[in-house]
């Protein structure tokens, strides 16, 4: 009965989220956070990110998590060797994450900002960017712009980690259907090389079989004309 209750609650959250997005596409994300309609929020760090942190498999330096939401992954990645910026267009999400995590021992190694990913201009570029449930939030026509921003925000030789979801057949969104080829189509022309693309064996619950972990290296010699 408990699992049935959780499933019903999750479906209700999804229904409310889609209604808010359909009513106000530009402000739907903020409305969703205000209403607590965030069905994508796991309530904990993404398991594969926790695994990569524990095994020392992430680059050090400056890291960015766009569309960070509550910020669990931001906090999990932050350390003396890695300062992490969590970016979200929702002011409510950023206020909550800042309040929730500001007293943690590693709080000086992360920060949260409410900014538009497509117009934000940070003072420094990043060594690492992690994308999960962000690429899939945009209609397919926006994906080339997403890739251009990733290229601009990463340092030469920097790494982009894409947790690809949802790899399935669906109409509409968000989340919009994704595939490996959709990432390749927009990243490879901008000088990104796929270092590895594997099934995410640590995917949670209903997302199992619908995710792949992609690790991309930005060329050290590619020069964008954008």
From Swiss-Prot:
InterPro entries to which the protein is assigned, alphabetical: SAM-dependent_MTases_sf, TPMT
Keywords carried by this UniProt record: Methyltransferase, Phosphoprotein, S-adenosyl-L-methionine, Transferase
Gene Ontology cellular-component annotations: chloroplast envelope; cytosol; peroxisome
Annotated protein name in UniProt: Probable thiol methyltransferase 2
Family: Belongs to the class I-like SAM-binding methyltransferase superfamily. TPMT family.
EC number: 2.1.1.9
Gene3D superfamilies, per database record: Vaccinia Virus protein VP39 (3.40.50.150)
Disruption phenotype: No visible phenotype under normal growth conditions.
Keyword flag S-adenosyl-L-methionine: yes
């Amino acid at each position: 009965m408990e699992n049935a209750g959780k499933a019903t609650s999750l479906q209700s959250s999804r229904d409310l989220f889609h209604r808010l997005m359909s009513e106000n596409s530009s402000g739907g994300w903020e409305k969703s956070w205000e209403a607590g309609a965030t069905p994508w929020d796991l309530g904990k760090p993404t398991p594969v990110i926790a695994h990569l942190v524990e095994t020392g498999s992430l680059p050090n330096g400056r890291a960015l998590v766009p569309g960070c939401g509550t910020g669990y992954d931001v906090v999990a990645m932050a350390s003396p060797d890695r300062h992490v910026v969590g970016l979200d267009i929702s002011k409510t999400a950023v206020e909550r994450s800042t309040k929730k995590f500001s007293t943690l021992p590693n709080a000086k190694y992360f920060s949260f900002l409410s900014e538009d990913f497509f117009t934000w201009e940070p003072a420094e570029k990043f060594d690492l960017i992690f994308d999960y449930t962000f690429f899939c939030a945009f209609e397919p026509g926006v994906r080339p712009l997403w890739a251009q921003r990733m290229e601009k925000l990463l340092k030469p030789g920097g790494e982009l980690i894409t947790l690809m979801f949802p790899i399935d057949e669906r109409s509409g969104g968000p989340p919009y259907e994704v595939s490996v080829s959709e990432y390749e189509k927009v990243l490879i022309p901008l000088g990104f090389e796929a270092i590895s693309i594997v099934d995410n064996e640590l995917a949670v619950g209903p997302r199992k079989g619908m995710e792949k972990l992609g690790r991309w290296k930005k060329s050290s010699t590619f020069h964008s004309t954008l």
